[in-house]
């Protein structure tokens, strides 16, 4: 998701999105450990999006 789209969301929506991203990150980690992750770049994408959301949550408070 683009930073512009994230800025349009409310704090509650960002927190919900962060929860979803962390679940996705956990799932990707498990797939990577078991050797079932075909697209390794997804872990990097999720990690960066988590950082974007956390940055926006910190700046709005």
Curated annotation (Swiss-Prot):
Domain of life: Bacteria
Record flagged with keyword Ribosomal protein: yes
Keyword terms of this UniProt record: Ribonucleoprotein, Ribosomal protein
InterPro entries documented for this protein: Ribosomal_protein_uL29, Ribosomal_uL29, Ribosomal_uL29_sf
GO molecular function, one term: structural constituent of ribosome
Any one GO cellular component localisation term in the record: cytosolic large ribosomal subunit
CDD domains in the cross-refs: Ribosomal_L29_HIP
BP GO annotations: translation
Record-linked SUPFAM superfamilies: Ribosomal protein L29 (L29p)
Pfam families documented for this protein: Ribosomal_L29 (PF00831)
HAMAP family (UniProt xref): Ribosomal_uL29
NCBIfam families cross-referenced by the UniProt entry: L29 (TIGR00012)
Family: Belongs to the universal ribosomal protein uL29 family.
Name recorded for this polypeptide: Large ribosomal subunit protein uL29
